[in-house]
Curated annotation (Swiss-Prot):
Primary site of residence: membrane
GO molecular function, one term: membrane insertase activity
Similarity section: Belongs to the OXA1/ALB3/YidC family. Type 1 subfamily.
Protein name: Membrane protein insertase YidC
Amino acid sequence: MDSQRNLLVIALLFVSFMIWQAWEQDKNPQPQTQQTTQTTTTAAGSAADQGVPASGQGKLITVKTDVLDLTINTRGGDVEQALLPTYPKELGSKEPFQLLETTPQFIYQAQSGLTGRDGPDNPANGPRPLYSVDNDTFVLADGQNELHVPMTWTDAAGNTFTKTFVLKRGEYAVNVNYSVQNAGEKPLEISTFGQLKQSINLPSHRDTGSSNFALHTFRGAAYSTPDEKYEKYKFDTIADNENLNVSSNGGWVAMLQQYFATAWIPRNDGTNNFYTANLGNGIAAIGYKSQPVLVQPGQTGAMTSTLWVGPEIQDKMAAVAPHLDLTVDYGWLWFISQPLFKLLKWIHSFLGNWGFSIIVITFIVRGIMYPLTKAQYTSMAKMRMLQPKIQAMRERLGDDKQRQSQEMMALYKAEKVNPLGGCFPLIIQMPIFLALYYMLMGSIELRHAPFALWIHDLSAQDPYYILPILMGVTMFFIQKMSPTTVTDPMQQKIMTFMPVIFTVFFLWFPSGLVLYYIVSNLVTIIQQQLIYRGLEKRGLHSREKKSS
């Protein structure tokens, strides 16, 4: 095994990953256990069973803070629009990113209210409440840290229901507080609910470019319980009426897309029912309904929940609810990606530039991996030294494959050489590369993050393809500087085109990842020369490149 054959291993692992990525994007449904799912027979059945209403017509009011611009419908008090003024829709644009939307082309809403037997949002009790408000516009003023938006409705029996949105400066978590005044003679049985609903099909104006096979990220629903910290639920699964139905004490439900999320976090002490529903017309929903609370005659009951609507900022999300930060989807290598991001963020606190931070973390990672790299090159050098003996043995034994295998293993044992020693360190390094890929694709901090010169967004592909070409050049130099024992003509052709193949693949990769790979290759060249000098002193390497 030598350096150039290792490139074949890299290529195999890389192509396998890309094939898996594309297959996961289009074909692989999210499996669900029998304990947490049930199949429904009608599209509206699940929503109706939960006592959750449809949208209604009312007056639209505007609520603005320094980080949120919400539009709330007084019919039910649903959040129908959400703009994020500190996050532009596109690089260089003054138009804010829109998370929640209610248009003929696309529906994405955060619904909430009071259901249960006596809840005003229960469809069995008539139309949803039409709340009254004092103003049409609520703005967080300078010097003000908290904004309250009270909405009140009184039913025919004289019971008063107040729904108050509480927003704080610099925060994406919105508390929704309920007050129920029972003016009747019988207890009121009330449950809170929170529901997120969204069009399954993504129109062109909502496409962030993540449909690119190399930039694909998860878009769909998710939930968390004390037993299941983070579970995805695909829109396709909901569309097939394979719906979630699980009880949980604590937890949250969410809808996710690249860099941004919405989530409902119930704040009651009892049990909540988490569910998904196919609402028909191409709309999927995930939500919760709390267990009923009794409000006695003459008494006032208080309930609350929290809506997260904004970017996936891990520290802030973790402070809002346990495991909510896991919505920053780092894939199955999250246990590597998370500490890497914390290290990257720490480096950035000193440098102030994410691109230079990636360069520094590359040196750190490659420095930590240096012992494995040295072991890899040493093993390959020993294997090259054995090639004459192996070739002589093959000529002596002819077509006797069994004898060849036995004597070869005996030779490896006698010379204390592990034939897989060159591959194993390489395989160990591959998860680091993939973890960095997930980290760069999932961290909001790298969205629209500039580096230098023409690189204005490390999370996007290089617009001029300069970095991928430089990456291919560094691969070419590594290949030319590496000794080889490859004699098969087909393998030689593959090795010749390997830098070109990788360059083509990396054309669509985020600039930050390509930057990492370029720096990693440069470090490889430096480490390679240092290791070769040590091997020369031990008689295990020669500067003359052999091809036999």
